[in-house]
Regions:
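Conserved core of the sugar-phosphate nucleotidyltransferase
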Residues: 128-216, 220
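Conserved N-terminal catalytic core of the sugar/cofactor nucleotidyltransferase
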Residues: 1-13, 27-119, 126-127, 131, ...
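Conserved catalytic-core motifs of eukaryotic protein kinase domains, centered on the activation segment
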Residues: 18-19
Length: 252
C-alpha cells in the first residue's frame, strides 16, 4: 500500500532559540527529522513531504534532503507554509508572522498528498515502533471519518530542562474521545509533572496519562474536512488573535 509521511518543519523554533528542525545532532551530522524519515521508510512509507518555510529550502536540501534522495531513491517533495495560503477571505493574514497552526501546515501540503498519510513534527523523536504502528493503522482507514493516533505516556515525553506542549488524551475502549492541548508541562525537581500554564505551583498531572505528540494517520479524504475546519477558523479570527493557531489535536 502506498503511504506518505508528512513532516511539519515550518515552525519558528522560538523556544529553542533557532531553527531546531535543521540543527545537527547525530554522530555524522544527522538532524532529528532524519531519524523519523528513515524509520518511516523502513516501516513501508514510500513518499516523503516536508512542510517548510520557503527560506529553509536551500538549507534543508543541503543538510539532508538531497542525501536521502540519493541513498534511498525516494523523492522528497517540499511544501511551503506561508500565511497567504488558504486565507483569501482574510487578506490581512498574509502579513502574519506566527504560523497559523498544524491544520494549516497539512493543508499547505495538500497538492502533494494522494495516499493515506501520517503527520509528524520535525522536532520530536518518535521511535521506530511508533512509525511501524501508524503504518499498520493506515490501511484500516476507510474514509475521512477514520483517523489514527499513536499515543505516549506523559512521563516519557517530558524534560527537566524546560516546558513542553502535549495533547492530553481521553480514551474509551481504545478510541480517542478528546484531546486537550496543554501548554507549559514541566517535570519539576520534586519528580512531579505539572501544568504550569496558570498561576502558582501548577496542576499535577498523571504521569501515566496518554498524550499526543502529533503522530496522526489520515485517509486522504480528511483533507477536505481540514479545509472546511480551517476556513471556519479563519473567519473567527479577530485583530487580537495574532498568535492563535488552528491545531490538529483541537480539530480531532
Amino acid at each position: 500500500m502506498d503511504m506518505t509521511l508528512v513532516v511539519m518543519a515550518a515552525g519558528l523554533g522560538s523556544r529553542y532559540g533557532g531553527v531546531k528542525q535543521i540543527e545537527r545532532l547525530g554522530p555524522d551530522g544527522e538532524i532529528l527529522m532524519e531519524y523519523a524519515i528513515y524509520d518511516a521508510l523502513r516501516a513501508g512509507f514510500d513518499r516523503i513531504v516536508l512542510i517548510i518555510k520557503p527560506s529553509m529550502l536551500e538549507d534543508v536540501r543541503a543538510l539532508f534532503g538531497d542525501r536521502i534522495e540519493q541513498r534511498t531513491g525516494i523523492r522528497i517533495d517540499y511544501a511551503f507554509q506561508t500565511p497567504e495560503r488558504f486565507t483569501a477571505a482574510r487578506p490581512e493574514l498574509a502579513q502574519r508572522q506566527k504560523p497559523l497552526g498544524t491544520v494549516h501546515a497539512v493543508l499547505c501540503a495538500r497538492d502533494a498528498i494522494e495516499t493515506p498519510f501520517a503527520v509528524i513534527n520535525a522536532d520530536d523523536f518518535y521511535g521506530r515502533g511508533a512509525l511501524d504502528a501508524i503504518a499498520a493503522a493506515l490501511p484500516q482507514l476507510g474514509s475521512a471519518q477514520d483517523a489514527a493516533m499513536v499515543g505516549y505516556r506523559l512521563k516519557n515525553t517530558v524534560s527537566p530542562f524546560g516546558t513542553v506542549t502535549r495533547g492530553v488524551c481521553a480514551t474509551q475502549d481504545g478510541l480517542l474521545r478528546k484531546v486537550q492541548e496543554t501548554y507549559k508541562i514541566r517535570l519539576c525537581p520534586d519528580g512531579l509533572i505539572r501544568d504550569m500554564s496558570g498561576e502558582g505551583e501548577g496542576i499535577v498531572l498523571d504521569p501515566e496519562a496518554l498524550v499526543s505528540m502529533n503522530l496522526w494517520g489520515y485517509h486522504p479524504q480528511m483533507l477536505d474536512v481540514m479545509a472546511q475546519y480551517f476556513d471556519d477558523f479563519v473567519h473567527t479570527l479577530t485583530p487580537g488573535d495574532e498568535k492563535r493557531e488552528c491545531l490538529l489535536p483541537v480539530m480531532m
